[in-house]
């Protein structure tokens, strides 16, 4: 063979194979043919830069190569075998110089071999062979040495096969067992020597490492030149034996050294099929390892240049050798010892070599490794991804299939031993799952840590350094600062603004005009202003809401500092009154601006989910809460300052002789006026404009004539509001805690004392009603609870009033500060409203006007006193407007509106409908109450003190429980404010301290007012009348009216809803409700009562209390006009005031009012309901069963099923007869006490017959007469006339769909809570029809008390059916009403909740 001139040409990049490692092809110079050296494919293009190492290796191999036996064809192949063999192992056919035909052929061979593998897959050996073959064909095609290009791949292959057939591998096997396999003369180097796939397959070449390395093989070639190249790929099977780099290099070296063989032997060896001869039986297929792991050089494909026919020739030989047992890799599986392929090999000539060139240009194939290692260890352990491993393992049915799968699809990657079985794969999956769970756990822990950090981070708004008491989770603060802003998402920024005082925006935002010098030093520490927020934009961007919150917090802090400094100046008396007023107005304006900004920010947060998300962090929420609390406390302090200034003015004014000449209430008026405005015409809420005409000089806050209470309050303001001894942070917290404590204490006391107070009130109301009946005139009638001094003060002439009233007021204030305020405001307001309405501004008038203003203010404040926040809110509104302070009677200070302790929501909430809240509402319904009081004649004014005290006290008392808690939450926090609104605060305090006396006084006041109120009960409907006294009063009235109208509209709607609810409840609770006429009359009466209530401010206070209701139902059966007024006020303020429909026909409209009041009393105070029934009335209405709704507390009067209509002759319909339910008698006595109510026409709900309650219940009139005799006819006649004169009215508490709307009676101003009116369906008490549902007559049941013999109501079957139908219809209507009511309630609630801005609340 012409091996001469064999030279290795470096296949340069000109091969177009990309940045392959240097590829070299051995080009044999033509020996005899003179053929030029040809690289495979493009050998001519190869640069002739032989690789020294490769050449050396090749020479060595060639030196050891013995001359090969050549067939003629082999000679041809030798001649053409001046082939350039790319010794470099390349993974892609691109890198090989083999022409594309080789690639295609190799591919065909691959395909064929795969098919054959499939055919022979039955045998693991065959499988292995197939796998190896395919691997070799696939992988090793790149590694295979190209056939002699001159001969053409097929020719060289055939010749080589021939040679192999001539060649006797056994000899060589004997000579060198490691070369026995090399029958296939494949380069160990990765140029795959083509050997029969059966051999390569047969010997999976686990001992691939044992296969003689190229260096060894070439040396062994002399012994077995054709067998010297057991290819590592042979292990894998296939004719292509991928060789390790070392093997590759060595194999290359051998041909290089043996140039003679290089052209012939080398080319043929590289292309020779292993054991082309039968002797190759020694080449056994040792299926030692099912895992054919490709050599490191993947894709080295021996040029399958043999024709398919030649391969077929060899097949039988391989089959023969297939029987040989494979030997383990440790035995260095002989190449030729494997079984021969039992199927013809594909035409490898069609398969092009795929050579993968290492990317590393400097790469040198490593020295061949020892082949005595297990192939698993020798072959590179290429791990697949867990997914691949699992997929392969699961898809593979067994090791053979796995090997086949891996050999076919993953020739390069080998599944690790531990992952070759499904169990192992499953275990791996479990392991991975566990790891994943661990990672998830760690992630969750990280999230928790982040959350903890977020929660832990706190922003402290205090300028002082962190105090030990203050749990500064945010860490130590280097210096006092108002704001420490952490960006929780990225807590990298913590900025301090030590001198926010330098930020003009803060002052602008706060509206504080005073220079920074005025601010207390604590305020100077950096309060982050919006302008400064950009400095912490990192935070702001992460949590814009947090940035806003911090900005607002800084503003609030600055404003707080200003307020503190202002407070210090005011308390020190350094500021003149005018400056105080101006500064206070400015502070309020700043506070309002801050509130507005806060509300806007809240709205933006609601609208912006991103902000909301940022706000969602507990830290942000805490910031918001703190900010809200701070704003609230600012409002409180401002109110306290206002109160203090008002107190000072009051002290100054009472000191003025002309003011003293005027009713002492003038001093109180300044208080209320101061509450609204420190100086200038102070428009009290609800037209109770504290007009300070020339005659009425607003006392400078510094005036020394403060009442003792005022002084105490002012002192308490100093002490409580800002305990100077404490650092600012602790001071604020202390104040807040004190406020909360006071508020809770007030609420506790009010709740605790409420039963007794109601009990006393009930008793007092009974007495007072009688007294009122006796003393329906001016307030001369002194309620028993009224202190004689107070009564005297009431009776005191105007001249005396100033002093006596003042003294009595002081006493009362000391006793019940609250009482005096209410007395003045409610009593005087109505009378003063009218009296002071006179244009004359004499001192008396001024005093009256002040009294009226106070009365109106206090009347509204009476409830508002309880909830000072409301008056504060109006004052704020007025201050904002810069005009007289108008307060919505129900409106509470922004704190209350915003949902703070005394928030409107609480006021309005069903819970607030409890007597306390309702009372406060009633009193809150300042306009109506004020107007009512305004309608009260001057006689009341003459006794403003007693009246005012009584009415406001009661109102306050009733309103206090909640308002008071609110107030105390706000005002108690700063008693000074309480002092400022001494009547309010004192009233609430007095209520708390002496609820009974309070209630009694209020009852008395309401009674006293009621007599006057009765005189002008209609005045209540026109709240404007009272609210339009003079100038500022008018403006205040206008402002009030604007807000009041809105509020009243809401209240009217709520009242309607409440009426519907009441009607629904009545219809549900009493299957035999009063006839439509009764209901209508009751409704009319209730509306009238509401009107009366509206006219009677004291009603408002009483309204909240059951005793008031009882008072309204005078024992004589005559409802004092005043109680009616009260009820009116209540209804105006709260649905509770709406009279409950009385199930008893007996309950005429007044009775419904009274009973509703009583029921309210029961509602408000179940206890009161129990004892609320007057002993007198108990005997009066025992046939009637009174029960209170579980949720609404509405009192229902139903004839007990036992109760039989007194008039046996009356129709069987029990409703035709007043229902003398065997009540405790209290309700009955109450209704009976009204007497007239019994006399009022009642329409039987069943029969529809309209009878006067007296007619319906002759006997009831008896008991009622007991009480009625006092005023049997007048109120009764009035009520009857009203009922008869006006269309039948439904109980004001409900909308009666069937009945016509109440007559022109002014809409009840019952202020229904924003919360759904009927959160719970009132427990429906279904009484069986008084008469048996069956035709049988119910056996008469004796009345509890001595009653006329009752005749069982007998109803015919038809009547029963009609009754049933009527009841069903009523029930259906009730359900409809209920659903409608719920919808209305929800709608109103939603509107109210979303209309917080309309409520002027700065806090939600």
UniProtKB/Swiss-Prot annotation:
It is found in: Cytoplasm, Cytoskeleton, Microtubule organizing center, Centrosome, Centriole; Nucleus. Residues 185-203, 534-549, 660-674, 686-707, 903-914, 921-933, 963-974, 1085-1098, 1221-1235 have a biased composition (Polar residues). The gene is Akna. Belongs to the AKNA family. It comes from Mus musculus (Mouse). Residues 1-304, 317-382, 494-549, 645-708, 755-1038, 1085-1185, 1208-1235, 1253-1286 are annotated as: Disordered. Centrosomal protein that plays a key role in cell delamination by regulating microtubule organization. Required for the delamination and retention of neural stem cells from the subventricular zone during neurogenesis. Also regulates the epithelial-to-mesenchymal transition in other epithelial cells. Acts by increasing centrosomal microtubule nucleation and recruiting nucleation factors and minus-end stabilizers, thereby destabilizing microtubules at the adherens junctions and mediating constriction of the apical endfoot. This is Microtubule organization protein AKNA. Interacts with DCTN1. Interacts with MAPRE1/EB1. Interacts with ODF2. Interacts with CAMSAP3. Residues 645-659, 803-813, 1155-1167 have a biased composition (Basic and acidic residues).
